[in-house]
Amino acid sequence: MASMLVAQRLACSFQHSYRLLVPGSRHISQAAAKVDVEFDYDGRLMKTEVPGLRCQELMKQLNIIQNAEAVHFFCNYEESRGNYLVDVDGNRMLDLYSQISSVPIGYSHPGLLKLIQQPQNASMFVNRPALGILLPENFVEKLRQSLLSVAPKGMSQLITMACGSCSNENGLKTIFMWYRSKERGQRGFPQEELETCMINQAPWCPDYSILSFMGAFHGRTMGCLATTHSKAIHKIDIPSFDWPIAPFPRLKYPLEEFVKENQQEEARCLEEVEDLIVKYRKKKKTVAGIIVEPIQSEGGDNHASDDFFRKLRDIPRKQCCAFLVDVVQTGGGCTGKFWAHEHWARDDPEDVMTSSKKMMTGGFFHKEEFRPNAPYRIFNTWLGDPSKNLLLAEVINIIKREDLLNNAAHAGKALLTGLLDLQARYPQFISRVRGRGTFCSFDTPDDSIRNKLILIARNKGVVLGGCGDKSIRFRPTLVFRDHHAHLFLNIFSDILADFK
C-alpha cells in the first residue's frame, strides 16, 4: 500500500508562491518541489453535498447508539492522502482542520505506512502493554527517539499519557503533590494523613487551587474542566471547584494600530492574576499553580504578546507556585516552532508542559523537582501507547528531514497574508485576522455567519473549523504548502464574493 501511495504522485504542475497585489486578485503558484507532491492529491473532487446519502445513513445508524449530533461526516481513511480528506460518498476535500489539529504530516504518509509494514514492529501494534509495570524492551530507546528528542529546555522528566485531557489532569496532580511536599518537608506520610485522605478530608486532601484564564480549554475531565472556560455546554451540570479565573487579554487588531491599548489590556490581566493569588490565599484556597495556553485555541484563538507571557511566567516564581504550559493544540510545529511557547524566548519558560494531538500521544514534561516521590501516584493502566511512540519517532524524522517547521512558518505567512487581503476586501465578513505559522484564524460578525461560511466551504471542498463565539480557525498539517494556501484563498474569495 505504501509503494502504491508513493507511486500515485501528482502529474500536474503546481506553481510557486506569488500573488497579485490588487483588489480581486487571484493567488497563483509555480511548480512545487517533489517533496510537496509525493503523496498528495492534485486537488478537490466533489460528487455530492456533505454529508451525502451514504454518510446520512451512517449518521442515522450511529444516532441509534449514541448522540451523533456533533458528527460532521464519515470518512474513507483508506483513500485520504496528504492534505486531502475523503468522505464515504467519495468527496475529496482540502482539510484545513486536520482532525482538530491532530494530524502531523498528512493522511497515509508513505513513511508511516512503510513503518507499520516492517515485521519487527508488528508486535508493538498488536500488543498494548500496561506501561507502568510491564514495558517492552525498547521503550526507553523509543522515548529517546521520539518525545525526548524534542524535549523543551530544562525538561528531563517525562510521563506519557493517552490524550490531552489526561495529560493536563495528571500535570495538575503533579503540581499539587509538589506543593504539598514542599509544605510537608522530607518526612513520609503520617498515618493520620493516610486515613483522612481516604475520606476526602482536609488537611490531607488540601484545599489547593489552580489559577486558569477565562476562554481557556484544558480538557473535560473533572480537574481539567475546572480550568476550562470556553463553552458552557462543556461544563453545565458538572460539579466543580472554587478555583480562581483570571481574564485573558482581548487584543485589538491590527496590532500595530493599538499598541498602547493592548499593553494596557495585558497589564490589567497580569495585575488581576496577582490579585487573585493573594485573594485565594486569604480564602485558604492557596494557588498551587497557574495553567495557560500559549494561544487560547478552543476559546477563540486568543493571542497575547510574548512580553505578556514572559511577565506572567515571573508571577508564579515570585508567588512560589508552579507554572503549567498547555501546548496540546499549539505543539508539534504548527506555529513555526516545535512548541508554541518557544516564541517567548525564555530560558525557563515552564515547570510542567503538557502535549498531545500532533504528537500522536499524550504526556507531560516536568522539572526534576516535580518528580513523584512514590510509585502509583501518577499512574494508569496504559500510560500512553508504545506504538504511537514508534510512529512519532518517524514523524519527527520527517519533520526534520523535510524542514517542516520552516515550511509551517512560510506557508503560514502565505495564508495570513491572503487572509489580510480578504479582510481588506470583505471587512463586512472578516475581522481580527491573526495567526502564528499556519495557526491562523479570523472573526466573523456572528456565529450564524461563521457556521454558514464553514458549511459553504465544506460543500466547495474545504474543511474548516470554528472556535470561540464567532471565529474560524485553520489547523492544517505540517505538509500544508503555499499552493494549498492559495487554493483555499481563491475558493474562499469566491465564497465571500457570492455570500449573502
From Swiss-Prot:
Residue range covered by the transit peptide: 1-28
One GO CC term, this protein: mitochondrial matrix
Residues with PTM N6-succinyllysine: 231, 252, 413
Cofactor dependency: pyridoxal 5'-phosphate; [2Fe-2S] cluster
Modification sites for N6-acetyllysine: 252, 279, 318, 413, 452, 470
Enzyme Commission number: 2.6.1.19, 2.6.1.22
Positions with a binding annotation for [2Fe-2S] cluster: 163, 166
Record's catalysed reaction(s): 4-aminobutanoate + 2-oxoglutarate = succinate semialdehyde + L-glutamate; (S)-3-amino-2-methylpropanoate + 2-oxoglutarate = 2-methyl-3-oxopropanoate + L-glutamate
GO terms, biological process: gamma-aminobutyric acid catabolic process; nervous system process
Protein's cellular compartments: Mitochondrion matrix
Oligomer and partners: Homodimer; disulfide-linked.
Protein name: 4-aminobutyrate aminotransferase, mitochondrial
Organism name: Bos taurus (Bovine)
Designated gene of the protein: ABAT
